[in-house]
Structure formats: C-alpha cells, structure tokens
C-alpha cells in the first residue's frame, strides 16, 4: 500500500499516558501506518506496555535504547528505521483525534509538508471524514518550533538530510525545522484540532519533553540561539524567525519561570546576550508595552527593575484572568491570595461524595473527633449546605468562595472521592483519602481500556492521587490493589473502613429501630436493600450516568409485599430518578439518604450487582443476592473483575426477577447453602473490621 505514515514516538517514563497514546493510533480511521516507539531508558513500566501492544498489532514496533540519550537521539533512531513515505512525530504522553492521520494524508496532496492544529486534552475535536474546506494556507511556516503534528514527505526529509541535533536535550526541534524556511512559500494547515497535547504541571508526575530544570533549559535555549544565528548569519529570514521565536519563548515561558523562581542571577546574563542581539536585528512579532520594558531591563541587566516589572505584570494578568468568570476568579484567589495566607493548623475540611452527603468514612472520623473533644475548627463541604449534623462544624457550599478559602487555609483535607485538580496542595497540607469501597471492578491502571465519559481518566486520576498523604484500606486484598492500581506508595491505614464501625456497634438493635422509624418503615417488616452500580458506557456526560431499573417492583410487591419492603439505592454517579410513587408503602427510593451504612444496618437482605457495597454489608453476615443480568458485558467488555464472580461470592448470581423472588422465598436455604463460602469471604475481606477504625485513625492523624 502507498502513503504509509511512519509515526515516531520517543518514550521516557510515560506509563501513565502511554496506553492512551497508543490506543489513539489503533483507533485511527486511517490504517496504513507504522508506529515506531523508542524506549529511551525508561525506568517505569513503559517498555512492557509497548511490548504488549507490539504483540497485538504488527504495525507497532519497539526499539529499546537501554540508556536515556534524549529525545533528539530517539527521534533520529526512529528516522533511521522508518519505512513509510511520510514521517510524523508524536509525544508519548499525547494522543490523536480519530481522524487526525486521515485528514493529514488526504489533504497533503502535492505539498511536501502539512500542519495540524494543537489542542489541550480536555477539548473535543469534533471532526468527521470526508472533510472539505478544512485547509488554510499560511505564510507563517512555524507558529511554534515543534515538529509535533506535522506530516513530512520522506523524500523531503532525505533530500535536506533533516535530523535533530543531539547536542541539545530540550530544544532540538528547530535544528530539524530551520532548513525548511526557504523551501516553500506557504504551508497548508488543518483548521480543526487533531492533536491532543497533555499539559502537565504536577511536579511528581513523569515529566513531558517540555518540562524540566528551568535554568538548564534557559541556558540551552540561549546557547542554541547563538549557534543558529551564527550558522544562518547570511540568511535574514532565518535570523528574523529566530528573533521572533525568542520573543515568543520569553512571553510563553521565561516570564512565568522568573515570576515563580528566584533564578535571576543564574540566567540574566544569558538572556541579556540574546536581547542585545535582537536589538540590532529586525523582528516582526508584536510585543506589548510591558514586554518592551521587561526586555529593556534584561538588556541592561537591571535585576531590580525587572523584578518590579514582572511583579506588576503578574498582578495585571491575574486581575484580567479573574474577570472572565466566577470560578476563574475563585481559582485565582486560591492560588495567589488564599494559599499565601498562614496555614490554619487546627482546621480540617471534610467532604463526602463531592459534597452530596453527610456520610461515609469522613463522617465517622469527624464524629469520633468531636466525641473525643479534640479542639479543631471543623469545615464540612456540601453541594447544599444546611444539613442537620452534630457538633459545631461550619458548612460551606462546594466550589463557593468560602470553599476555596478554607481549602487553601486548612492543614487537613479528609475526603472519600476526588478533590478538583485545580486545587494544588500547599506545603504542610495533609490529605487523608478515605476511599469509598473494597474494589470489585478493576481500577485505573489495572484497566486495559477506559469506557467512561472522561477519555483522560487515567491521567487525571494519577495527577490527583499524587496529593494523597494517607489512604485507608479495609483488607490486605485492597492494599495490594491500591498500591498497584493507584501507584500509591505513601502510608496506608490498614484498620478497616471507619464507615463500617457502626456495623460492629454494641447497640445495633436500638439503631435499627431508630433508622426504620426515620424512614417510616414498619418495624414488623423485613427490609430488602437493592443497591446497584452504574455502567461505564451508559452516560449523559462525565459524572452523570444512565440507569434503567430491571427490578420488577410490581411482581415483588405482589409476591413479597406482606413480609418485605424494598429500599432502592443507586450510586451517586447515576443521574436518573427512580419513580416509586406507584409502590407507596412497599418501595422507598433512598438514593439521597445520606449514609448507606445506616441502610445496611436495617437491611435483612442485600441485592446488588457489581457495586462494592457487598464487601461492607458482609460485616453483618446477612444474606446477599447478586442480580447480574448483564454479567458477560460488564465482566468481559467494560471493567473486568478482581475476583471470580461465579466462584468467590458469598451468595448466588441471579439473572431474572423469577430467580430473585424464588431466592428470597427460600432465603434460609440460600444462607445455609452459601455458609461455608460466606465464612471464607468474611475472613478475607472483613477480618480487619472491629469497630474501632475511626478511633485508630483519629489517634494517628489528629493526635
């Protein structure tokens, strides 16, 4: 086949993003390509990921360099073995829109090179094929000095002997691109976003090729600038281009580095040498009044003046950005005002399920602290403040100004779900992640494919979990999985879940009567709790999942209504409302009931599917039925399970409403049939639960 594209991908410690990158190639509408992945001495699992895909797809080829030699060497190595008529460069932490390669190859026609447009990872390209009128022509050949997202003819690369200068670790792209300046007058560009750039700012995550030691990068940039201006001294176009590129580099990178780091003495001399050169040559890039003054201060090596100008520039930029929306204003205040205030060492912020509930382990830890009379300033985050809770905690609305203020000032964060990525931890901040269940479904880096509404699920999760100082585990099974699937290496509290303390309390009978009365459930009726999970592939948008009730309430009421009532409890991700109006007195929708642990306590039978609720409920040693009507799809396509559903569960799998009714009518026989398996299950998953997890964690974290 003609028009084969060789995609060259250097790889260095990007296991977090690599699968997403490779999957974006496999999913391309255009199939005539080869991917050459050069493992540049990675110390993580990148090489094994590459080798695994290489076995599955003959278009994927790997090269292992053993020792890290830098991106320039890796790309040159890829060029040496590429067999395609076209060359394309991709970073291993980035990904492509489904139609990216097809758009490039179908529109390059008689041209030697074609450019694509970049996009940040969280935006959608919304492109479809065939595409007409998606090409524009530009005289500005290189708006940035990156080889990424450019499709080159191999004949052009060979004719001009285009290679990357391996003397440069960070800024080698321009040595490949500069020879093209005089080669053509205009460059075609795809107008739609086709390349998804992964911008990462987490200092603990693997670094992309554009994020490293700032002093070394600036010094290398200056060195390369002077070398190239010398090489192209007789080429006015090249000199003008290099001058324009430096100004862009200053505006997009150097300014921010100098504003955040005190490295003036290390780089001012170098920067001044470039500005002095630019002052004697022409450039076409428009620059603002502030930039002109800053460059003048750099030229004159006036550090004091430069500091003042950059400080003023930062204030104006922040003010301008803040005026563009309330949330942007709040995030700006968080980053530049609130986190600069003294940390409140006796303040704890609690949040459960994105502020939807007063529940779960954060609730139990909070109540343990107030029972112990520990003198802290307690803040509870709710989507709708005004809940009736014990103690004197201040309630704040999630994502409000007060929320950002207290998140910035509190020493302690306690949450069972994820806190927004925009909230960067400050030094000294302690984040206790309680988590929300023993895992049945595969998690994060144990998942081969992600079918959720968020295509960046793994990368987002990794960045957010780097903030966790402590993580709670309910059993050794969970500890092993969390360490691997979350890549978590900090302290794990292995005491069981605080939320399950109530299931081991001495006054369970009194509590059951109280909770039944609160829900208007007759004390003489037995309770069936149905608690299903969401389906990853059925959603309206990220965080809002569809759910279709397969539970035949009418039949259940007819067959079991004299003895039982049913509580329906959907996962907090599920957006659909369950209507139980026709079953008043029999079916109760308790999806918005704050604390599911209290529902466990009053439930005589649990019916679930792939929700992890049964791990907690098993503490009570009461019967569990598993309504798994779509088992094959969920097990084999969506997530996959950590345990064998057919052999390890402490109760039967049922697939129809007939089986549910029959099992409930014969629940004593079911319990007897599964007793041995239940005992084994209890020992494995509930053995750490003794009703004192909250007390132990209180003593360890808040001593």
Task: Place the predicted regions along the sequence by residue.
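A donor-sugar binding/catalytic signature common to diverse glycosyltransferases
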Residues: 413-442, 593-638
């Amino acid at each position: 086949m003609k028009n084969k594209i060789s995609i060259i991908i250097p790889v260095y410690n990007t296991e977090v993003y690599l699968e997403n990158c490779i999957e974006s190639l496999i999913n391309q509408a255009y199939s005539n390509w080869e991917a050459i992945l050069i493992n540049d001495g990675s110390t993580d699992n990148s090489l094994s990921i590459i080798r695994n895909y290489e076995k599955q797809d003959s278009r994927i080829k790997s090269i292992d360099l053993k020792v890290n030699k830098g991106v320039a060497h890796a790309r040159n190595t890829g060029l040496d073995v590429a067999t395609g008529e076209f060359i394309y460069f991709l970073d291993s932490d980035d990904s492509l829109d489904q139609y990216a390669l097809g758009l490039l190859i179908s529109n390059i026609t008689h041209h030697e090179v074609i450019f694509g447009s970049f996009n940040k990872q969280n935006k959608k390209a919304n492109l479809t094929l065939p595409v007409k009128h998606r090409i524009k022509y530009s005289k500005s050949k290189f708006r940035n000095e990156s080889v990424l997202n450019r499709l080159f003819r191999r004949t052009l690369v060979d004719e001009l002997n285009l290679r990357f200068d391996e003397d440069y670790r960070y800024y080698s792209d321009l040595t490949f691109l500069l020879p093209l300046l005089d080669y053509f007058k205009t460059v075609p560009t795809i107008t739609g976003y086709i390349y998804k750039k992964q911008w990462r700012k987490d200092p603990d995550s693997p670094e992309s090729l554009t994020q490293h030691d700032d002093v070394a990068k600036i010094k290398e940039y200056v060195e390369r600038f002077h070398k190239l201006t010398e090489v192209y001294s007789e080429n006015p176009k090249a000199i003008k281009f290099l001058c324009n590129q430096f100004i862009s580099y200053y505006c997009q990178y150097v300014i921010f580095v100098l504003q955040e780091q005190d490295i003036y003495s290390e780089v001012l001399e170098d920067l001044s040498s470039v500005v002095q050169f630019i002052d004697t040559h022409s450039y076409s890039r428009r620059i603002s009044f502030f930039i002109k003054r800053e460059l003048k201060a750099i030229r004159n090596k006036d550090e004091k003046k430069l500091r003042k100008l950059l400080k003023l520039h930062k204030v104006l930029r922040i003010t301008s950005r803040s005026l563009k929306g309330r949330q942007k204003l709040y995030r700006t205040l968080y980053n530049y005002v609130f986190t600069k205030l003294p940390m409140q060492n006796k303040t704890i912020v609690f949040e459960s399920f994105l502020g939807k509930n007063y529940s779960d382990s954060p609730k139990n830890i909070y109540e343990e602290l107030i029972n112990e009379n520990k003198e802290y300033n307690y803040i509870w985050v709710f989507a709708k403040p005004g809940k009736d809770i014990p103690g004197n905690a201040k309630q704040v609305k999630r994502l409000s100004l007060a929320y950002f203020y207290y998140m910035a000032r509190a020493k302690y964060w306690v949450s069972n779900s994820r806190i927004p990525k925009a909230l960067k931890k400050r030094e000294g901040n302690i984040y206790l992640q309680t988590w929300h269940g023993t895992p049945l479904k595969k998690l994060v880096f144990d998942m081969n494919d992600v079918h959720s509404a968020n295509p960046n699920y793994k990368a987002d999760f990794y960045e957010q979990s780097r903030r966790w100082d402590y993580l709670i585990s309910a059993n050794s099974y969970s500890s092993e999985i969390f360490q691997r699937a979350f890549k978590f290496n900090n302290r794990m509290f292995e005491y069981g879940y605080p939320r399950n303390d109530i299931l081991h309390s001495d006054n369970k009978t009194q509590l059951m009567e109280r909770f039944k009365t609160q829900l208007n459930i007759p004390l003489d009726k037995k309770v069936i709790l149905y608690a299903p999970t969401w389906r990853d592939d059925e959603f309206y948008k990220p965080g809002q999942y569809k759910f279709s009730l397969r539970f035949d309430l009418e039949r259940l009421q007819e067959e079991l209504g004299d003895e039982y009532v049913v509580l329906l409890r959907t996962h907090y991700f599920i957006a659909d409302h369950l209507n139980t109006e026709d079953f008043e007195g029999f079916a109760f929708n308790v999806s918005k009931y704050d604390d599911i642990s209290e529902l466990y306590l009053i439930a005589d039978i649990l019916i679930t599917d792939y929700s992890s609720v049964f791990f907690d409920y098993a503490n009570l040693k009461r019967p569990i039925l598993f309504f798994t009507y779509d088992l094959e799809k969920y097990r084999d396509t969506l997530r996959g399970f950590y345990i064998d559903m057919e052999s390890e569960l402490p109760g039967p799998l049922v697939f129809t409403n007939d089986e549910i009714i029959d099992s409930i009518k014969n629940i004593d026989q079911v319990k007897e049939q599964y007793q041995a398996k239940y005992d084994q299950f209890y020992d494995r998953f509930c053995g750490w639960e003794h009703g004192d997890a909250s007390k132990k964690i209180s003593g360890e974290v808040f001593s």
